[in-house]
């Protein structure tokens, strides 16, 4: 029987202190994931995940491997319990692409943990500018606003829900112009850099050696790429995707539509929170979006 399931994995912003703690206390499979990430990084990140403080967890260099570890812990328990069907495709929102690749057997957990830790460190080091979320404005209008003010569209999250990245002064101009053009709301995001923009080019170049050196296998199901929504299986193409997505827009609307075209009708959001499960039905009405966290108790 052909699968109608997509595994999708969240990105930054889905973290909270205490995530995965109860699960790790009762599940050896979950505990093994957190221990493996601690070992790979050489320090007890799990202590920060489970007990905080929040200001330590929210740091990009901790947040990225923390979300990866928690998501894979959830995944390990669901697979052990037989509660997660095989996928027709996998996808991840930004950071979530690494988690998707681990789950799909393309990338080892330890390698992914080290890469995303370094990715977070580099993003902090090169953290210039910021991001704003724009609600209630057509994408075409917003792209005009971006061109006119010198910012870049970072994330196409859902129809009428998009984020911009750029230098602070340019973002202020973009926010004002977006409101003038009809945006319902513009919200400054609590991030320390202009993610998914050309300002992140030094991050991509510095991370390139790690990504190119990491052993990569063909995933059990194609990864729907954030950059252009193509289904990827070839390890070299996947490496290129992981580098390009640092500076390119996350085209999540196109990713979800491509997954639907690929046969996905049930989207399992594997990780903390339910942000993606809120976005997906707005992109493709009628599909089932299941956040797994509540299923784990």
Residue positions per predicted region:
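Structured loop/turn residues at beta-strand edges in well-structured enzyme cores
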Residues: 3, 85, 181, 218-219, ...
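FabD-like malonyl-/acyl-CoA
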Residues: 1-141, 154, 185, 189, ...
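A short, acidic, amphipathic alpha-helical segment used as a generic capping/interface helix at domain edges
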Residues: 247-264
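Charged catalytic carboxylate motif
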Residues: 29, 66, 70, 170, ...
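Non-catalytic positions within long, well-ordered alpha-helices that form the structural scaffold/packing
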Residues: 79, 179, 260-263
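Conserved functional loop/turn residues at catalytic and ligand-binding sites
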Residues: 94, 215, 263
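Alpha/beta catalytic cores of group-transfer enzymes, especially the acyltransferase/condensing modules
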Residues: 12-14, 41, 103-249
